[in-house]
Amino acid sequence: MPTGLKFNSSLSEANVVILCAPYDRTASYLKGTARGPAAIVDALKYQVETWDRYTGAIPSPGRKAALCELTKLNRCSPETMVKRVRREYEKYLGQAFILLLGGEHSVTTGALEALAARQDAKNITVCQVDAHLDLRPDDSDYSDSPHGAYAHSTVMRRAFDLGFKTLHIGTRAYAKEEMSFAREHGLKVFEWGSGPVPAAGDIVKAIATDTVYLSIDVDGIDPAHMPATGTPVQGGLEWYYTIGLLKSIFENKKVAGADIVEVAPRPY
């Protein structure tokens, strides 16, 4: 009875690429997200069962999966990091489904720049699960050493600037100016803790395009379920709700790519 997923394909033959971007230069609270990709991959290799009870099948039978890591990424400036992520993402775009593993949320901007260069961004909705809106123009308002337009708190503003539609799920911590920007531009925000939890189907119906890019910042999940993050916020999505939401999105939309970011492994 084997456990763990296998990554035994070459990158040139893979139709699933796990792109690891260990970066946390602009993290505004606790550090550690640079260790996130390695921890996730380690768990995938040695901890998870090969039988998936949600689908009743072995995950992605017939898929050829490969790992790719951007080495020494944490030495880069935010601008250089985004360029490196974009270049690597472009290599496999169109060949494989790419799951980007952060690292802090700023790594997502590189993936979105690659997508926007290849497809019409206005036909794609970036669906973000996140406690925060990440709509700041830069990080100068809260950082003593600001990192500019490519900080982790700016990723959805960069998505907007690139022409993507955006949808925010699990929001419960934001600046007044961020929410004003969202309302001014008609961005769809599903706040948590301000009323009843929305049905997953209602969120899917609110996605205005057939194609989505999924960005999962794990601080969007209730820290009672996901404590291993640098910016935990009380409340958030419950684990099984999150699984159901993702399942509904994959069943009803074309997912152009996805990322999981802001995992900061705890020293158990």
Locations of the language-model features?
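Conserved alpha-helical scaffold segments that buttress catalytic/binding sites
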Residues: 1-268
